[in-house]
Each structure stands twice: as C-alpha cells, then as structure tokens.
Swiss-Prot record:
Protein name: Oxalate oxidase 2
Similarity section: Belongs to the germin family.
Subunit-level organization: Oligomer (believed to be a pentamer but probably hexamer).
Database matches in Pfam families: Cupin_1
Cleavable signal peptide: 1-23
Alphabetized UniProt keyword annotations: Apoplast, Cell wall, Disulfide bond, Glycoprotein, Manganese, Metal-binding, Oxidoreductase, Secreted, Signal, Stress response
Induction comment from the UniProt entry of this chain: By salt stress.
Cystine residue pairs: 33-49
Main location: secreted
Tissues expressing this chain: Root.
Task performed by this protein: Releases hydrogen peroxide in the apoplast. May play an important role in several aspects of plant growth and defense mechanisms.
Source taxon at top rank: Eukaryota
Amino acid sequence: MGYSKTLAVSLFAVLLLAPAVLASDPDPLQDFCVADLDGKAVSVNGHPCKPMSEAGDDFLFSSKLAKAGNTSTPNGSAVTELDVAEWPGTNTLGVSMNRVDFAPGGTNPPHVHPRATEIGIVMKGELLVGILGSLDSGNKLYSRVVRAGETFLIPRGLMHFQFNVGKTEASMVVSFNSQNPGIVFVPLTLFGSNPPIPTPVLTKALRVEAGVVELLKSKFAAGF
C-alpha cells in the first residue's frame, strides 16, 4: 500500500475513533432509562433499565441536595453524592452532582475523579480550590479562593482539593459529565488500601522512615 493510501486509512481510523474519545459516558438511545439497581444482569457502562411502568413518577426530581451534611468528621466536611446509585434516573444520561459542606477549617482532601470533568459553584462562604497539573505540565498547583456565586472547573483525572479558608461554614455544589465519576482519595488510597501497600514501597516513594508510614497507616485503618 502506498504512502498516500496508508495516510488516508489512518486518518479515516482517527475520525472513526474521535467521537468515542471525546465522549465521556455513552450516548443514550432512549429518553429515560431509570436504573434497576437490584437487577441481576451484568452491567457495562450503566445499569439495566426498569420498565417505565415500574419507574414511578419522580425519577426526574430529587431533594437530596437540599439538606446540609454533617461536618463533624475528621476532615470537617461532608459529601452528599447524587450519582446513579443515589438517583437512578440519571442512568445513561451522563450527569451527576455532589453537594459538599465544610466546617470552618474543613477540607475536601486531595482526590481524583477518574471518569469525569467537574464544574462547581460555591454556594456559601469561601473556599480555597486547588488543582494540580500533571508532571508534563510542570506539576503546577493552580489555586484561588473562590467565593459565593463564583465557579471553578477541574479537568478529568487531575488531583484537586477544597479548603474552607473562611470563619463560617461553606458549601458548594458540583456537577460531573458522568453518572458515576468515581473518586480516589489520595491519602486513603496510599495509607488505607486493602490489602495495604507494603511499607518499604511507601518509605522509598515518600522518602521517610518506616515509623512515619506506619503512623499514617494507623490514621487511615478505619477509612475516612
């Protein structure tokens, strides 16, 4: 095959793959597919649909985010999730939301959403929002104090955090372009995994003594 034909075939393949690369969740093929969370069928990129006759009449509405969460936690924050597990009506629609409430000095620790881009608005108070670039972008920290009514954007897969820098309670609402964005809390992943990451791996990676690693593991033995 000549060079021009090879190039044409390659370009055609790229064009075919482009929609899949650009999309997050798969596009729906029906108006509604209320998730059957109790179904026995194997689910791939979504859940089986309930028959509409069994879906009820409230699957498009939720009041779950109307109530503040309890911030009496070790992190001083509370995350109220509204993904497909909590709102089955979002199944196949490629969207979900969270509400996060913060006590003064509370934090939403460094974490990653592996399957979604995040956009958020601060509803009350003021939050330091930090986004960490990847190594090929210089491992740069992008941060700003975001106040009530202001918004922020977090690209898919980048580590980020929020911290209440105000003297009063704060809250934010965020949305994702996935019904199940996933979350990886960095401290819990490193020091509370099951089974644990071997201590020598962490001592070498973090350049600390074994006693420091064991202390940190003890802090996360019970999870968050």
